[in-house]
């Protein structure tokens, strides 16, 4: 089983009950973090931005890690995200093929860091979804939908026809080019 750096958490929290509001609204968020502590921190960060609820006046109700139902089947994942670059905020849609959503999210973080120089704190995942093959948009994920796909054999190692011709030290370096 592959261990991923980012785990998906479901965090549930609310503002503290007061005399004016005895039953405050409960908020639930699904987010990715390396551990539970960072997931809680991210939850309060988003809640402070979206609603008038701060950690000092808030209450954490539950935090659960979400696991994939069948992590052996390859699926197409779509990720809608918002990221902060040197020029401002941008919205983006990305597609990945992976066995788990955590794997697809990790691919996304690696790609965003390499292509756009955007690190983990500057990326906000808006939505994720499993996408059927006919609704895929990106060519990078569509190329694997062909059932007759072939991969080229890049290097060919020539083996000796008999054990007698097998030597540990060759007089000349073998040519592996096809």
Swiss-Prot record:
* InterPro entries, per database record: Ribosomal_eL20, Ribosomal_eL20_dom, Ribosomal_eL20_eukaryotes
What are the TM regions of this chain, as residue ranges?
Answer: none
Tell me, which GO biological process terms does this entry list?
Answer: translation
What are the alphabetically sorted keywords of the record?
A: Ribonucleoprotein, Ribosomal protein
Q: Which Pfam families match?
A: Ribosomal_L18A
Record's note on what induces expression: By wounding.
Does Membrane show up as a keyword for this record? no
> What are the recorded GO MF terms, alphabetically?
structural constituent of ribosome
Protein name per UniProt: Large ribosomal subunit protein eL20
Source organism (scientific name): Castanea sativa
């Amino acid at each position: 089983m592959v261990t991923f750096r980012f785990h998906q958490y479901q965090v549930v929290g609310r503002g503290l009950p007061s005399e004016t509001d005895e039953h405050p609204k409960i908020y639930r968020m699904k987010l990715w973090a390396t551990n539970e502590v960072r997931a809680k921190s991210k939850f309060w960060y988003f809640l402070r931005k979206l609603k008038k609820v701060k950690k000092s006046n808030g209450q954490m109700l539950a935090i659960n890690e979400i696991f994939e139902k069948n992590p052996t089947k390859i699926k197409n994942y779509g990720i809608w995200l918002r990221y902060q670059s040197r020029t401002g905020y941008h919205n983006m849609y990305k597609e990945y093929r992976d066995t788990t959503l955590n794997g697809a999210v990790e691919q996304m973080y690696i790609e965003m860091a390499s292509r756009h120089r955007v690190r983990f704190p500057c990326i906000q995942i808006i939505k994720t979804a499993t996408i059927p093959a006919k609704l895929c948009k990106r060519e990078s994920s569509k190329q694997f939908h062909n059932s007759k796909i072939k991969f080229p054999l890049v290097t060919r190692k020539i083996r000796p026809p008999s054990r007698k011709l097998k030597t540990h030290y060759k007089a000349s370096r073998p040519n592996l080019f096809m």
